[in-house]
């Protein structure tokens, strides 16, 4: 059994990158992983459909338990949907809407992916996390920033937003887990 510490914070003794990290910087996968950050400022245009399709295809190629693929994804780039839902959010959460630069409840993103899981399968949430990681890293590799969101999902599960959750048309039994803006 080998144990090692792992943190994104450099140790006090560390003054630069280790030799092993420097040696792999020419690896595009590692470069993508190391460059990824949560992005909260977006261009006003929706992600192009062909790029979104690539992101989704890479997501569904994520490892998953017993190949159950116990996830469902809905992508929304319809500004009416986002704006109408945001208006309800603002009525329910007026202080949140007072933030400087607030446009919508998804950090002003014009495209949002909603990921649902199957609570009848105990590994579904893990599978959904792996799906999302693939999607986020694919987007990063294409120069598209993203951010996982939980707050808007909590709101979407509220009675005030129930109609919009229903519009996502997830299969019976599936529950919204998180969103990616």
Tell what function each PLM region has.
Residues 1-4:
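Sec-dependent bacterial lipoprotein signal peptides
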Residues 6-109:
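N-terminal amphipathic, basic helical "cap/leader" segment at the start of enzyme domains
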Residues 59, 119-164:
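Small-aliphatic-rich amphipathic alpha-helix that forms the alpha element of a beta-alpha
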Residues 71, 151, 176-177:
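Proline- and acidic/polar-enriched loop/turn elements at helix boundaries
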Residues 78, 88, 116-120, 151-152:
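Beta-hairpin (beta-strand-turn-beta-strand) motif
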Residues 95-97, 103-105, 163-181:
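A glycine-rich helix N-cap at a beta->alpha junction
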Residues 112-116, 180:
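Active-site-flanking beta-strand signature of metal-NTP-handling nucleotidyl enzymes
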């Amino acid at each position: 059994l080998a144990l090692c510490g792992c943190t994104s914070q450099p140790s006090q003794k560390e003054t630069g990158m280790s030799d092993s990290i420097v040696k792999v910087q020419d690896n595009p996968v590692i470069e993508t992983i190391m460059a990824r950050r949560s992005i909260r400022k977006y261009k006003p245009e929706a992600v192009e459909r062909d790029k979104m399709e690539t992101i989704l295809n890479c997501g569904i190629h994520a490892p998953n338990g017993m190949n159950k693929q116990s996830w469902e994804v809905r992508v929304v780039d319809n500004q009416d949907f986002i704006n109408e839902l945001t208006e309800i959010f603002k009525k329910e959460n007026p202080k949140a809407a007072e933030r400087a630069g607030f446009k919508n409840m998804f950090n002003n993103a014009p495209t949002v992916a909603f990921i649902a899981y199957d609570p009848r399968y105990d590994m579904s949430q893990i599978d959904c996390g792996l799906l999302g990681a693939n999607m986020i890293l694919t987007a990063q590799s294409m120069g598209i920033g993203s951010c996982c969101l939980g707050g808007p999902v909590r709101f979407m599960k509220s009675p005030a937003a129930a109609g919009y959750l229903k519009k996502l048309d997830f299969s019976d039994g599936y529950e919204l887990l998180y969103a990616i803006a």
